[in-house]
């Protein structure tokens, strides 16, 4: 199964990242990194709801996004809208102008109830507004499966943020279900326990401009 980037609804004019050749990431990180949400939207986080939370890890090496309603399910009666939901978040990133970051990998946390023959997948597209490049992560699990999960994937390539103190960073994440058994059922939803969200941890690499 392949993740179709088109189904995340990104027009070519919204394309992604700053196309700069890969370099060895720096071991140091900036002492400041803040996020301000510009907007969010999608079937899994309508723009008029407060269903997305985000923060920067204390070491500035990851961004954590928590989704309250990023869920998908499949059975004999579900529609395509039930079987896939997405959430696009546009963040204003502010930091030091002599550093750039790139998405290195993503880890997804949630809860799955999957019969045999059912597959659930997470995928994300990352890009910086005004740049013509993008990166993505995509990973999944197959049934039979019950309980909380952790799924990891490395970014398919490095795209680096602009050298500047503030810039828009876009993350479009979806969850989807597929099945090769018409009688099977499946659901990917919020993690069981106190956290109670679908969580995405975006690991960052840094380098100096």
Curated annotation (Swiss-Prot):
PANTHER family, per database record: PSEUDOURIDINE SYNTHASE RSUA_RLUA-LIKE DOMAIN-CONTAINING PROTEIN, PTHR38847
Region (Disordered): 171-195
Transmembrane segments: none
Superkingdom of the source species: Eukaryota
Pfam families assigned to the protein according to its UniProt record, in alphabetical order: DUF4360 (PF14273)
Organism: Arthroderma benhamiae (strain ATCC MYA-4681 / CBS 112371)
GO cellular component: extracellular region
Leader sequence residues: 1-19
Location(s) in or outside the cell: Secreted
Record bears the keyword Secreted: yes
Glycosylated residues (UniProt): 69, 183
Keywords attached to this entry: Glycoprotein, Secreted, Signal
Name the record gives this protein: Uncharacterized secreted protein ARB_00107
């Amino acid at each position: 199964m392949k993740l179709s980037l088109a189904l995340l609804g990104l027009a070519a004019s919204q394309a992604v990242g700053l196309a700069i050749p890969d370099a060895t990431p720096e071991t140091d990180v900036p002492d400041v990194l803040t996020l301000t949400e510009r907007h969010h939207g999608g079937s899994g986080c309508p723009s008029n709801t407060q269903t997305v939370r985000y923060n920067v890890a204390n070491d500035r090496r990851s961004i954590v996004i928590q989704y309250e309603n990023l869920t998908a399910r499949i059975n004999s009666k579900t529609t395509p809208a039930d079987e896939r939901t997405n959430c696009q978040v546009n963040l204003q990133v502010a930091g030091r102008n002599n550093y750039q970051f790139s998405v290195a990998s993503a880890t997804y946390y949630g809860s799955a109830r999957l019969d045999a023959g059912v597959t659930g997948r997470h995928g994300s597209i990352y890009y910086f507004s005004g740049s013509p490049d993008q990166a993505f992560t995509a990973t999944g699990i197959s049934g039979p499966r019950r309980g909380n999960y952790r799924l990891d994937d490395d970014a398919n390539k490095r795209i680096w943020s602009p050298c500047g103190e503030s810039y828009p960073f876009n993350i479009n994440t979806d969850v989807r279900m597929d099945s090769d058994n018409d009688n099977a059922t499946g659901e990917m939803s919020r993690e069981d326990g106190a956290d109670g969200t679908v969580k995405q941890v975006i690991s960052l690499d840094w380098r100096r401009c």
